[in-house]
Amino acid sequence: MSAVRSKICGITRIEDALAAVEAGADAIGFVFYAKSPRAVTVQQARSIIAALPPFVTTVGLFVNASRCELGEILDAVPLDLLQFHGDETAAECEGWHRPYIKALRVKAGDNIAAACDAYPSASGVLLDTYVEGVPGGTGEAFDWSLIPQGLSKPLILAGGLTPENVADAIARVRPYAVDVSGGVEASKGIKDHAKIRAFINAVR
């Protein structure tokens, strides 16, 4: 099995982004969703990205953003990858001249394979915990046994991951990548650098 990639999401400060990169994170995530306690402004994201070394993937997370809002952000912020975390259709995720991943919130009874197949142009699917009315970042894990084998897209596992459980999650799910936000925080939007290091070390 090739090395599992890691993304640290919900970055709001330069020092947290640099700590994640130094620890070995492959990607840094920025939340462009005003209702999130981890939301960043265009200027915040631009400043953080400008401080990053090369070969770090920058990801923008969006939740049911309008085409106008999304276009304005993409014109201003150099994002490598888009992550759609709302009810966006495949057509709404396409056409931005950037690869995208689609987040799917998992609950018992879902046909995850069919949901994955509904986004044929996606670079991957991110599986997160379903909580009513909350698009993501809940800090809660879901039942990994619900994930079917042989999904048509690379699988990014999210939802309640921590330095303590991520190695077990990888062994059981065998994802392409793991995504963490709350599991490496001191408080919402503020990362704990020791937890980031512990998480990345556990992924390896």
Swiss-Prot record:
Question: InterPro entries from the entry?
Answer: Aldolase_TIM, PRAI_dom, RibuloseP-bd_barrel, TrpF_fam
Q: What is its EC number?
A: 5.3.1.24
The protein's UniProt keywords, in alphabetical order, are: Amino-acid biosynthesis, Aromatic amino acid biosynthesis, Isomerase, Tryptophan biosynthesis
One MF term in GO for this entry? phosphoribosylanthranilate isomerase activity
Record GO biological process: L-tryptophan biosynthetic process
Catalysed reaction(s) here are: N-(5-phospho-beta-D-ribosyl)anthranilate = 1-(2-carboxyphenylamino)-1-deoxy-D-ribulose 5-phosphate
By what name is this protein known?
N-(5'-phosphoribosyl)anthranilate isomerase
State the organism of origin: Pseudomonas fluorescens (strain Pf0-1)
Q: What is the lineage of its organism?
A: Bacteria, Pseudomonadati, Pseudomonadota, Gammaproteobacteria, Pseudomonadales
